[in-house]
């Protein structure tokens, strides 16, 4: 269903997976990867957004470390590689690459000019930073790891942001969740949804903590949010 395009930066080019909707022009959504690269899960999410009428694009944000990463969460060796990639990844440069992705897809003939973003895990933190640092029109963060360390940027949060937090997330402990809520609750442009009993990556199909009902609930909330802010 998808295609590959190249995105140009001052440091070089990187690939992105693109899925196009049946009708265009349409609003675009940048899908921000987990620590497993642009794998089948990310491509399926991208395809699914296209099926909902969005021009969806998933950039290879690990390209500066290792281009073309496509691994799963199904083996210890893959987990070790994923964490090594995450540790080598530069978040600040990654946000700049997201802005380059936004610029590229916004200029695509199939885009109507509106661009949102949705990110998962590491991508959840990047989605938060997309809302504070880029000109994306809206962003959704699923179980973002490390956001509690980035809350100094909350003052610059001018874009609509939705967050999905797993109450039992082993990577985002309750203390971190409390800090996030203290900083962001009450902001008119922020919506936070907490999922009781859920662990990290509850919306990752095939994952250890996947929960179909809450994944569907979060997905429906995200789509409604995009419909509101992207049209």
Where are these regions (language model features)?
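N-terminal cap/leader regions of alpha/beta-hydrolase-fold enzymes
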Residues: 1-231
């Amino acid at each position: 269903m998808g295609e590959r395009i190249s995105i140009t930066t001052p440091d070089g080019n990187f690939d992105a997976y693109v899925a196009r909707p049946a009708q265009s022009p349409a609003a675009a959504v940048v899908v921000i990867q987990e620590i497993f690269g642009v794998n089948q899960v990310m491509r399926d999410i991208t395809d699914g957004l296209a099926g909902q009428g969005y021009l969806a694009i998933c950039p290879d944000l690990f390209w500066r470390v290792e281009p073309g990463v496509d691994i799963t969460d199904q083996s210890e060796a893959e987990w070790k590689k994923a964490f090594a990639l995450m540790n080598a990844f530069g978040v600040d440069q990654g946000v700049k690459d997201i802005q380059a992705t936004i610029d590229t897809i916004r200029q695509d003939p199939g885009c109507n000019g509106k661009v949102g973003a949705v990110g998962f895990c590491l991508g959840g933190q990047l989605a938060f930073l997309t809302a504070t640092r880029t000109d994306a029109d809206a962003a959704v963060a699923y179980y973002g790891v490390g956001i509690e360390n980035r809350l100094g940027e909350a003052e610059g949060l001018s874009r609509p942001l939705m967050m999905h937090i797993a109450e039992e997330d082993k990577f985002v402990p309750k203390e971190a969740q409390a800090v996030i809520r203290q900083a962001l609750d009450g902001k008119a442009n922020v919506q936070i949804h907490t999922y009781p009993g859920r662990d990290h990556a509850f919306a990752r199909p095939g994952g250890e903590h996947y929960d179909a009902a809450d994944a569907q609930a979060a997905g429906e909330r995200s789509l409604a949010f995009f419909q509101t802010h992207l049209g």
